[in-house]
Swiss-Prot record:
Component of the acetyl coenzyme A carboxylase (ACC) complex. Biotin carboxylase (BC) catalyzes the carboxylation of biotin on its carrier protein (BCCP) and then the CO(2) group is transferred by the transcarboxylase to acetyl-CoA to form malonyl-CoA. Acetyl-CoA carboxylase is a heterohexamer composed of biotin carboxyl carrier protein, biotin carboxylase and 2 subunits each of ACCase subunit alpha and ACCase plastid-coded subunit beta (accD). This is Acetyl-coenzyme A carboxylase carboxyl transferase subunit beta, chloroplastic. It comes from Atropa belladonna (Belladonna). Gene3D superfamilies: 2-enoyl-CoA Hydratase, Chain A, domain 1. Zn(2+) binds at residues 222, 225, 241, 244. The gene is accD. It comes from the Eukaryota.
Length: 487
């Protein structure tokens, strides 16, 4: 049996006539005739393979809230199961052998070493994939519900036991699992399950919110695979996800540390700060107050850092935009700092690097922010055409708006990071303006590279060496090599 056959064993009651149980495989599939008698037993419904299921075991927590589910075994016997998470109720509609098996599984679960010693096996969300055809469907549905109940119980002991699989850890579920349960008792809370004639109560070991807040700062969640990356190690891995290799956002300081040799960074224009040229006041927060809050949050004065440094011994002028500061938006100060950097590089005959990460022009400064596009482009014209110097533009995710329309696309060499989101107008803006759906991936670096918009897509771990080779190719050499050549 293929593993995905057991990807889903539960389905909502309103889908009862649309989905059935494969008689030979014990699997769910859509029925071919949707007009048949709704009273017909599920065991007579014909099913087919290669289908997309409603949801799998790992998705149960997202679907079960206050709903009735219809489950059935391969004999066609149906059972209505009711879950009410808010009131912590679990009910089955009739007293059958299935009920007794399920009830026994609850008791065995409650008395198991799981609550006392912590979970030491594989991830329960993926145990269903290891089932084979010899397992009965009843056992599987028991396991599905059992796994779901396990996922709802605070598992502090899994932290202590040092589980290596993030999927079975309570930290993972509290950070990635979405909505947290409302619980005001610090000393713990209880979960009650009710069947006909019996009540089961399982104690939770601690308050979920407390644990969530306690460990949230230790982890960074991947935007692509939603896996957790230990923040302490993420910087040494260049903010690349350990699970899927996705390039996460980096601060400007981290990028400078990545590209510039240690001890060679000399920042420029650090004391330049934004004012409020058009006295922009929003209902939520005045512009100047917003600037102050971002300065405190990021430790930066503006959305770009500029300066001089050495890249593998080669002197370079570099500007690095920071998306954490008001989305990397380009205001008058950002434009002025980049313009001064370009002019300084032209006077000192230095190669130029600008790392772009921006949402575009800053609306709080009106047309002044738009004029920065023309000012920077004019400075680049003199730098590239009159001074005949070398400019490398590095596009990271996201690069949009006025930055894309100006200096982002003016590089002699344009480099993009893998999976970077690069566009002029964002997907949402296009769809709302034109009432047309933007194809998925049409604004990703890989797709745009095929259309000729970039020269290279370079991963972070290779970026510094690639830049070094490019500079040497354009006759910019390390300082020690320059002095030896002069001699």
């Amino acid at each position: 049996m293929e593993r995905w056959w057991f990807n889903s064993m539960l389905f909502k009651k309103e889908f009862e006539r649309r989905c059935g149980l494969n008689k030979s495989m014990g699997s769910l599939g859509p029925i071919e005739n949707t007009s048949e008698d709704p009273n017909r037993k599920v065991k007579n419904i014909h099913s087919c393979s290669n289908v997309d299921y409603l949801f799998g075991v790992k998705d149960i927590r997202n679907f079960i809230s206050d709903d009735t589910f219809l489950v059935s075994d391969r004999n066609g016997d149906s059972y209505s199961i009711y879950f009410d998470i808010e009131n912590q109720i679990f009910e089955i509609d009739n007293d059958h052998s299935f009920l007794s098996e399920l009830e026994s599984s609850f008791y065995s679960y409650r008395n198991s070493s799981y609550l006392n010693n912590g979970f030491r096996g594989e991830d329960p969300y993926y145990n269903s994939y290891m089932y084979d055809t010899q397992y009965s469907w009843n056992n599987h549905i028991n396991s599905c519900i059992d796994n779901y109940l396990q996922s709802q119980i605070c598992i502090d002991t899994s932290i202590i036991s040092g589980s290596e699989n993030y999927g079975d850890s309570y930290i993972y579920r509290t950070i990635c699992g979405g909505e947290s349960r409302n619980s005001s008792e610090n000393e713990g809370s209880s979960k009650r399950t009710r069947t006909k004639g019996s009540d089961l109560t399982i104690r939770e070991s601690s308050n979920d919110l407390e644990v969530t807040q306690k460990y949230r700062h230790l982890w960074v969640q991947c935007e692509n695979c939603y896996g957790l990356n230990y923040k302490k190690f993420l910087k040494s891995k260049m903010n690349i996800c350990e699970q899927c290799g996705y390039h996460l956002k980096m601060s400007s300081s981290d990028r400078i540390e990545l590209l510039i040799d240690a001890g060679t960074w000399d920042p420029m224009d650090e004391d330049m700060v934004s004012l409020d040229p058009i006295e922009f006041h929003s209902e939520e927060e005045p512009y100047k107050d917003r600037i102050d809050s971002y300065q405190r949050k990021t430790g930066l004065t503006e959305a770009v850092q500029t300066g001089i440094g050495q890249l593998n011994g080669i002197p370079v002028a570099i500007g690095v935009m920071d998306f954490q500061f008001m989305g990397g938006s380009m205001g008058s100060v950002v434009g002025e700092k980049i313009t001064r950097l370009i002019e300084h590089a032209a006077n000192q005959i230095l190669p130029l690097i600008i790392v772009c990460a921006s949402g575009g022009a800053r609306m709080q400064e009106g047309s002044l922010s738009l004029m920065q596009m023309a000012k920077i482009s004019s400075a680049l014209y003199d730098y590239q055409l009159n001074k005949k110097l070398f400019y490398v533009s590095i596009l990271t995710s996201p690069t949009t708006g006025g930055v894309t329309a100006s200096f982002g696309m003016l590089g002699d060499i344009i480099i993009a990071e893998p999976n970077a989101y690069i566009a002029f107008a964002g997907k949402r803006v296009i769809e709302q303006t034109l009432n047309k759906t933007v194809p998925e991936g049409s604004q990703a670096a890989e797709y745009l590279f095929q259309k000729g918009l970039f020269d290279q897509i370079v991963p972070r771990n290779l970026l510094k060496s690639v830049l070094s080779e490019l500079f040497k190719l354009h006759a910019f050499f390390p300082l020690n090599q320059k002095s030896s050549k002069i001699k």
